[in-house]
Amino acid sequence: MKMDLTGKRALIAGGSRGIGLAIADAYAQAGADVSICARTEGPLREAEVALKKHGHKVLATPCDLGDANAIKQWVEASAKSLGGIDILVNNASGFGRTDDEAGWAVSVQIDLMATVRACHAAMPYLEARGGSILHISSISGLGASVRTPPYGAIKAALIEYTQTQALSYAGKKIRVNCIAPGSIFFEGGTWDIAKRDKPELYERILAGIPSGRFGIPEEIATVATFLASDLASWVTGQTIAVDGGPNL
């Protein structure tokens, strides 16, 4: 069986690096036209060049995902350019690194409300012919975590939101699922920085992964491609942990 997305139109919020870029790349390889957005122009342009090598349509748009109007404009412009929307991936995160007003505010706005707003903006297009919504949460949302409270709490909210949406939209032929990644290593990412600046934390987290290594973005992208494809046509409301087994 082949995970085929030929003819699909996919939007990936937070798609210029790491997990988001890996998902966009996997979707393009599977035949989809893709639209990505992120805050920073430089990585977006690099991602655009890489994605276009697969021969499908690629849009790369700077977007402040804390701005409700900017999200709506990105979704609507993407739908117009691609001819519709079949897949929406919400991957952006503010990371909520501090347990204070600022940390909670960024997690609520970027991890949660940007997701809600993108879903609202995309819904008319998804309802037109059915489709798939995918939220990227975290294993920090599945239980107690070394992360700060805002990050884990809002990632947990995404898991509940997935279930509620799946129940609400099943009759409209829209599937909603969630991936909870574990510790994912990529250049310039959280664990790349920790390896250099906080080696004790890096080694402690690594020691807690039964698989003996950090994951890579492509391992999340493989599951994301399955969930977006027709092979997962009867899968909805699920959160899949892709984590190497630390919670076993």
Where are these regions (language model features)?
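A glycine/serine/threonine-rich, flexible loop-to-helix segment
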Residues: 1, 49, 53, 171, ...
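Short, small/polar-rich loop/turn modules that mediate ligand/substrate recognition or access, typified
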Residues: 170, 175, 235-237
